[in-house]
């Protein structure tokens, strides 16, 4: 299994640039390498979820707070645009990381974060990256990942 993971990481290197840099492309490539090891379909970066993750990161930076719930109680999923119409959604947050592999590995070592990455109910993700912290100057980068799956639209046969 570990050999397959290494091969997948090397294969993604050509597409993602410096694989250590924390970028949305590198983060999703690393998450997808873990999903592939478990024979799960890959996550796809979705424009609507990316906009939502970016808006969420910006609001945290503007308000100098960090967490899954805003100080006013707003949940992370309130940022997802109505046109995404999600059936399932989740969020991973991280701060203070310098490399994408270490960031994703730390999520994989956390049961809740791992569950989001490996969740069969998720097909899409949106990723926002901020240099530093939303609470002021800090080392490393802060990352928001919103996971989702759109509702299945039923077509009337009448």
Positions of PLM-derived features:
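Sec-dependent N-terminal signal peptides
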Residues: 4-12
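Boundary at the C-terminal end of the N-terminal hydrophobic targeting segment
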Residues: 14-16
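A short alpha-helix/helix-coil micro-patch that ends at or immediately precedes a cysteine
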Residues: 19-62
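Surface-exposed patches in mature extracellular/periplasmic domains of secreted proteins
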Residues: 37-51, 64-73, 114-129
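Short, surface-exposed glycine/acidic/tryptophan-bearing loops
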Residues: 51-98, 117
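Disulfide-stabilized extracellular recognition modules
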Residues: 94-158
């Amino acid at each position: 299994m570990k050999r397959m993971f290494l091969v997948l990481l090397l294969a993604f290197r050509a597409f993602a640039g410096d694989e250590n840099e924390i970028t949305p492309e590198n983060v999703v490539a690393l998450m997808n390498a873990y999903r592939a090891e478990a024979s799960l379909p890959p996550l796809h970066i979705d424009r609507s979820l990316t906009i939502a993750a970016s808006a969420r990161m910006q609001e945290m930076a503007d308000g100098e707070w960090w967490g899954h719930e805003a100080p006013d109680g707003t949940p992370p999923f309130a940022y997802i645009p109505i046109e995404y119409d999600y059936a399932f959604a989740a969020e991973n947050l991280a701060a203070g990381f310098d490399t994408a592999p270490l960031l994703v590995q730390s999520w994989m070592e956390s049961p809740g974060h791992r569950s989001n990455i490996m969740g069969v109910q998720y097909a899409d993700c949106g990723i926002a990256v901020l240099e530093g912290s939303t609470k002021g100057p800090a080392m490393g980068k802060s990352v928001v990942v919103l996971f989702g799956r759109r509702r299945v639209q039923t077509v009337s046969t009448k």
